Amino acid sequence: MITNSFTNNFQFIKDTGILKDFPLSVKRILVFQTVNFLLEPPNGNTQFIVTSKEHLQWIMEITEQGFLLPIEDSQIILQCIELYKKWLFDPKHKPTPLIDDDDEYFHKKIIEHLTLIFQPRSYPHYISMSNNNSNNNSNNSNININNNNNNNNNNNNNNNNNNNNNNNNNSNNTNSGSNNKESSNNNSPILSSSNSGSGSSLSLNKDKEGGGSNSGSFLGVNQQSSPPPQQISATTTAATSPTTPTTPIKDTLQQQFLQQEVGGFNEVVQQQQQQQQQQQQQQQQQQQQQQQQQSPSITTGTVKGSKYRESVMPGSSMMVQSSTTALYSSNNYSGNVQLPNISVKELIDSHSVLCQKVLQIYLEMSRGTYSRSFSTDTLEHWNRLMLSITDCILGIHSNSDEMLARNLCPLLLKTLFEVWLQSKTLNPTLWNSLTKYAQGWFHHMPTVNQWNLTCLALTTPLVQSIYTNDHQSKSTITIRLDETSIEFEKEYLYYAWNRILNLIGNPNQIKSPAIFSEAITGIFHLVSMFLSVTNDGNAILHIFGSWIFEAVKTIKPGFDEGISLGSEILLHIFLSCSRKIEFLPIYLSCFYTCISEALWCDGKILRDTIIHSQNIFSSGLPGSRILIPSYIRALNHILTAQGTNDPELRRCAIKILGSILCLPNRYETVKFHNFFPGRTIDPYPPLPNDIIDGKHNELTLPPNEINTYDDLKPHLAYLILSALNTEMSSSNLLTLIWYIMFYQLEYQHQHVKPYPDGKLITSSFIHQSINTILKKCSSFTNQWSHDVILSSFQLLSDLASQHQRIPNFLENASTVVRKLCKFITFKCKETNMSPETEDLISLGCSTIADWVVVSPWIFEGNYLTDTSTFYMVFNALSVAMGAKSPNDIISSNASISSSVSNTGISSIGGGGSSGSGNSSQPSSTGSGSGGVDSGSKSNSSSSSSSQPSSTGGSGNNSNSANGGSFKRPKPYINNNISPKVKEVAQCALKAIMSKISYFPNPYNATPTNTSSKVTESDIITQIKAKAEKHLGIKNFPSEQSLRFYAIGDSIIITVIDQPFTSTSSSPSDSYVTLIIRDMSGKSVINSQLAFLPFKQREISEIQQPITNEKESQIDDGDDSVPTNTTATTIDNTISNNNTTTTSNNSIKSTSNNKVPIKKRSQYNCNEEPFISSYIENVEDFGDLSSYIEKHIDENFTKLIDNQMEVEKQKLFANKYSLTPSITTHPPVLKTSFNGDCKLQQARILLTHLGFLNQENRNKLTPLENSVQFFQSLNMLDSVSERVQIKIPIIYVKKGDSTEDDIYNNVTSNTTQDYQDFIASLGWLVPISTHTGFLGDLDKKNLTHGQFTPYYATHSREMVFFVSTMMPNSDIANNSSQEHKKKLINKTNVSVIWFNGSIEVYEKTLLETFPHAIQIVITPLENDLFRLKTLRKATHSNRMKTGPVNDEIIISKHILANVIRLSVVNSNQSLLNLSSGDGKTQHIYTNRKKLISDITESFKHDMTIQKFYEFHFEPLDQSQLYQNTENLPMANNFKFVKTSSVNLFRKDRTQSALIGTFTLPPPPISPTISPQPSPHLSSSGGSWASSKGGSTQPTTPSGRTSNFLSRRPNLSQSEDQSHK
């Protein structure tokens, strides 16, 4: 029973309604014949048949009765519908009275008659259920049908009482009046059947079907234009549950119905005969089914072979019949013909199709001219009829069939809203009634769908009219519905939008979760429409806020979908508008309460809240950090779960975790508001025991309640560690592992307080993080992917740079190095090594080198008692270079040592394998005392032998027993190791050997250079200057002092004889300068012979001048005695100086009578010089004296006396040529530089080193001196041994839209945070005097400014191109911006400082710059910064690097450090991408290859004789060294050996062409306000001195040898300082 309907039983004209008392068969024949005739009139025109209003009135009354026929007569009803359709839309068939219908009477009657088809019907009970296939084809819906005589008892599970069913059916089939007899004769439409499967009776109330109506419509319409509402009764089953929305029937169904017409009853009779033959079988089957089936509902079906078919309309669940049997014809018809068996479902589908045909006519009328030509009264009357129809079909208390309602609902509602909006009614009564009755329709899903579509159609022009200028000048606005458009005035649009929006009432009152979710979805679309044109979040919340807040705050079981949508809407509103408006406090309070409630839920509510609130802490929303405790609970629930299949949820959770990491360091003791005092955070699952390693490394347990920010620190640590152990997505792991670095950087700050127990914040965390990474990376089960392991190794390499602030660094470093060594040793055992494995081993070797090089920790601590780490390093690197692990051959080495000791022979194991089968072959490696054997490798495990060892390899044990001799095998080489791995291992070993604890080096060198800048030309100039100073020789041939050699193919050495020092020209002070060029750079070393300990030379000690070699011929014998010339020289020296000082020995003597001569070998050179003394001769010469006395010759005596007197006088005059100290003087020092060959000390040095021995002849190769060779050396010096990176820094103000706007910014117009950031990037150096890497900055004209930030470590150099520090005027080109663009756009990675939101930059400015990777920095409040790495689409999937992999919020004090690391790693990823196969070479490898090319191209092959003569002969004039810095390279020059290094490539030294597998650690990053480096000069902030822009050399204490630094003209400045 429909209550409060808008229908009324009208009083009809007395002259009408005569057909109401006719039998059904008569009415059927009359309607059929009349309508069929009018559809196809003889003359083809209806206007000549229906000429008067009376005729039209009579025909319409007949047609009205056609609409009231039973549904079984659907073909006749369809013809009636087609007749009205022709009259309405076909002018040719439109009757004349209908054309002249000025008062629209007949049009109203047509609309009313069409509504009769929607009258609830009772469907007959003769249903064929015997066909099982029909049951399968049906929609398996159970239909409970009641008849018109209140057969409720039969519906209440009276399924087993067939007698009662039959009685009820008989009573139902009873008809009143004259129809009783006819109904008893016509058994076909009143078949009584008891369905065994349904258990309920189905009957047709003939009185209700055939006689009931003398009304103009099923609503009862009279002639009045505005009938009052009155309820109408109808008897059908009420709808019990909502169904899936359906789509309207297409116009093609009409053709299907018409095609099924037949000519007479012949077909009917044939069908009846076939059915009668099967009737008995069907009845038996029905009885069996009744016993088997216990369901109280009816399963509908069709008769086997029937013409009725079921089809599913596209996009709809509605089942419609494809054809209807033509039961009647114009030639033969009998009311006694038995109708075929028809299922209820087919009848309902037929009814649905008829109703849909009517609704299509209504739509066509509303979209055509009728809606514009009808009067307001007619339109409102039409609206009332549509409202009544809709409520009758869809209302809560409706008696219409549920399936019929489900089939008609979508098209019915669409028609209602279109007709209603086309009418443009302002009648408040109608609108109020629509609002009232619509509340009873929302239990149908299509109702919500149609409401959503209508609201969205009205909202689109509404927001454009209010917030844009599109409709400002228009008086009307076009509303675009599904298939039509309507012109509205603005005022009516606003009125209709508000009315339609509030039809739904409060969506939270909807009882169905699915419909509630659909309603919230519609609200979401409306809110999104508003947000697309306005940022006024308060206005949007005024409209929708109450609905959404209630939906989210009231958590109802089963409504998760709608609640999650409500949470998404709130987050969408607040996060998108937070930076543009201030929300009202009441809205903020409600928002935080709702989101907090959602975060304490599980399932879809929590998932959607996390996903859509990932940017909540970077949005600038006031007070958003009050939600942190709730987010911690949610992150605990998500990140600690094992094996989740929702990587997107975990990605957003990890992003939120990154937004919280920095906050405890900023707000330590600030308290939180507790939304839910009774709720506590669930305890974290325990971490694996193998990552803790002792109680002292256990993390502090997080508290159950979070009261302050300090309480967050252990929670964050546990979340990171737990997520590392549970995360399965590689993409998420690439972001998560870098949180270890952020946590370490944030909490290693000096102002961070330790825990109450005294432990540092990061001590336990960093230890367990390292253990977790190493456990996952070295796992044999491949728990992490290849990309994740590579990124993890990069992280470990970068952590080494923080060694000074990592707690327990020695322990952590030992753990990292030991486990990586085991990892490398294990991976090198693979027989078929994949490229991924090669990358892992290479990066592992480089990571080991980084941890070893940063400090001498490997030699500290317990090194004296535990050397396992030390040996493991070289074991792993040797295995990576192709050697065999000593652990694998220790047994064979032990047996070899024992056998060798028995024969008196021992050898150092060269890695040979006892089981290799090659041990019987002798090695060709030569040996010699003092020789250099670069190819031999000694095994540390064989060092236990106490006997002298010789170069060789361990061989088979049987060799020692064969004749007492031992044959050395060939060295073991692992052929499975790729050349790439070997090269990287060699480079790592070279870095350890040459760079350990060597940056910055201890010789007052600056971070600018790690290689010497001294060249051969500088030293030649120094020698010439000293020769002119000491000897007065101009143009001293110092070029003869140079010789170039190659040691193997990896080292180029230059030996230079230095005959003079800066203060002396004594031969004893001469020395040799060695310039060594290898893969690690260039080193300059001075070597000097020393026979006594060096002492600090005083300034007053002046060397004795070199004596002319021709005037000082001194015998070098042991008993030498000075000659006269020598005595004169010595005498002159004594008379002038009284003391003679030599370079190495000071010889003193005292005067006596006699000087006994003593051999030199009797004296110790360390003792004081010997002292001679005169001793009296007491020998007896008596006989000779007496003889002389007897034979005295006076003359002779006189002569003797005179001679003696003269001598006496002479001696007296010369003081007898005697002094108190008389000694034998040593040989006078000689010089060997007077000849043409100046190579003297260098030859001695090479001899002592064993290079000139015949055994080592092939180790040292002289190189040809030529201009091309000297130019190649200059090119080699220009190849840096460190990675060189150019980093552009671009400042973008809010509002900048073009490149010119951006590049016009200068430092003075920037913010203080930006200036602090620039200051913290590196050291500010002057461009004109800087000696380090500058990229393409102009040093000559200073086009790019005078200063630039520079930063360097032991493995890389960085120069920053700061756009705001560059002038805006280019003098050379007279261009204001072009010089900046050319410089900055050359790089692939840039850093963008944007004073706005990242989302705005990504939408508007990302494509402004050509860089493939852009790291964007946006400042937040309280010294916090939001960072995000934006990648161009062409590279986004292959360039995920850290630390800023996706998005993070960090503090100010770590900003510069994070940016440097991110740029370095991003450059490395681009290098890997540009190399094609993803394999880039180590930076050392480029130098090594170039050295090999130079050696092969310029080696000088000599015979043995020529080789030795080469060291004594002077060079030809063409072979003398030339300074070729300014000479162009010959275009036709090519290396003999093919090389991958392009000698003529100008930009070869840039970072884009030099890759590295390592990410070496920089020194401690500068603070926010960096202090000047101690090496900076006061003039420009550079390490350059005021004289020449170089570093002043100093000699370390305790050394006399001068380690030449990087400055030319070194000794000249020293000489000037002594003047």
UniProtKB/Swiss-Prot annotation:
It comes from the Eukaryota. Residues 130-204, 231-249, 916-926, 934-965, 1574-1590 have a biased composition (Low complexity). GO terms for cellular component: cytoplasm; macropinocytic cup; plasma membrane; protein-containing complex. SUPFAM superfamilies: Rap/Ran-GAP. Residues 128-249, 289-316, 907-974, 1134-1153, 1554-1619 are annotated as: Disordered. InterPro entries: RALGAPB, Rap/Ran-GAP_sf, Rap/Ran_GAP_dom, RGPA/RALGAPB_N. One of its GO terms (molecular function) is GTPase activator activity. One of its GO terms (biological process) is regulation of macropinocytosis. Keywords: Coiled coil, GTPase activation. Residues 1273-1494 form the Rap-GAP domain. Pfam families: RALGAPB_N, Rap_GAP. Residues 1591-1619 have a biased composition (Polar residues). Residues 1559-1573 have a biased composition (Pro residues). Residues 265-295 form a coiled coil. PANTHER family: RAL GTPASE-ACTIVATING PROTEIN SUBUNIT BETA. This is Rap-GAP domain-containing protein DDB_G0281809. It comes from Dictyostelium discoideum.
